[in-house]
Each structure stands twice: as C-alpha cells, then as structure tokens.
C-alpha cells in the first residue's frame, strides 16, 4: 500500500501510476484525513482511471482533533476530551459523495459507530464500489474497558459504547461490514506510560487477533466460516490477492489452531518488540498451533 498524497498531507496526489507499476495495490493516507476535497477528488479520479483501490479513514478532523475518548458516559465521568460519533458519520458521508462523483474503488478502513452504518448501507444498495472494515478491538471492547485511564486501551478511533460495539458485531454478521482487521499499531513503553490524554494511541494485535476473534465465536455472534471470511477471504479479495482461501492452486498460507484452548494472556510472552496489548492479563481461548507460508512451516507452538 502506498500513500495517496505526498507526505500524506492531503494536498497533492502522489505518482499513483508509477507506484502502481512498482507494485502498490492500494493507496491511503492512513489516519491523516484531508480537508481539501478538491485534492482528494483528483486523487480518486486518477485512481479510478487505473482501477486502483483507495483506502480512507472516515473522520471529520475538525471534530475529532485532540480527542482521546468517545463522547458519552465514560468521557463525562473521567473528564476526557471526547469526539462525537457524528465525526465518523460526517467523514464517511463526505467520502461516499466523492466516491459517487468519481466512481473509484473505495474501502473505509474503520467503521466503529452505529451512526455511520446507514450511509454505508445506502452506498452499497446504490451500487457504489465500496467496502468497509472494523477493528477487532472495536468488536470485543468498549469505552468502559479503559477503566482507570489504562493507556493500553487508547486506540484510534477511541473505543466506543457497548451499543456501538454490538452494532458493529451485527454489521459484520449481516455483511454491511466486510472486513475485520487487527489494526496492529505498536507503541513503545515510554509513549504509553503517560497521562491518558498525552499517551500515544494504538495497540499491538497480530498475536492476539485470533484469540480475540474467538470471543465473537464463543459468544455465539459469528460462526467460524463467517469469522474467517471477514478476517481473510474478504480482505484478500478486495486487494486482489490469491490468499485467504482453501482452494487448489491457491497459496498454501495456513494455520492450525485449537479454538477452545484456554490461556492467560501475558504481554511479556508476545514476540512483538512492543507489548502494548489491551488484553494483558485476560483469559482467552484459541491458540495457533502451527503456521505455514507458501507451504513452508514457519511456526510451531511450544508443547
């Protein structure tokens, strides 16, 4: 994936054609949201001419700037600067208007609020080439999990209300949301050991992705085929990759796992250099026993 605009500053598009020729399969400015609709329209129109996928972060930066939590009971009780769920809806509706104008292939990286879902559903019903994702954290945690300003739970967008979390689970189940992502965002210890408002957002998630997802399975929200469709097949299809499926001639990228294996999450056992997981100390189920990439075994769990 390559940047959509130079320096990801939202003002001038990158050399999308050259980057695509070099192997870029999608274009995004990640968390940075441009307020220059004309610049983004030009970038989308050019991406459309090349059949490229544009990935955006639906958010109104004017409303969300400086926020550390979602507006609601928790932020009010703790006195934390908060962002309204309307910021996500407004950002998404702007993006979808530009998609309608340009016809570009579009993916919303994180939908986390119930208020954004109607706009997404309308766009799909209208035949726009749009997909959307949400993170495993927004499917399994809510605003009150932050507790006493626990910075490992500070993510972007912030954790939402329980009503929003349940709405996201239902949206994955009915296909309104296509992709569940890890949104793996490492942060060093020093950037997390700060007052909540000053701490860096983000959480490591690659190693906790599967056991966290198993919470949805064990709670009866999603069966395994639906879960892995959203975690593997749908993102691979959207990116035009051959992975994410068990099929003849498909890459043998496989995992062997026990969905019921219980364990206590200890962040110091993570292989990642960063240890900022919100699941530290949590009782979890679902262990990866072995991993193959391209038919070669690259991991085996300790017995």
Regions found by a protein language model. Give the residues of each.
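Metal-cofactor-binding active-site regions of metalloenzymes
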Residues: 1-12
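His/Asp/Glu-enriched, well-ordered alpha-helical/loop segment
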Residues: 77-105, 152, 173-174, 178-180, ...
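Ser/Thr-centric signal marking residues that sit
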Residues: 131-134, 182, 208, 291
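C-terminal cap of metal-dependent C-N hydrolases
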Residues: 195-198, 251-303
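Short, glycine-/Ser/Thr-/acidic-enriched flexible segments
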Residues: 113, 137, 185-187, 261-262, ...
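Glycine/Thr-rich phosphate-binding loops of Rossmann-like dinucleotide-binding domains
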Residues: 37, 64, 117, 140, ...
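Histidine/acidic residue-rich metal-binding segments in metalloenzymes
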Residues: 11-180
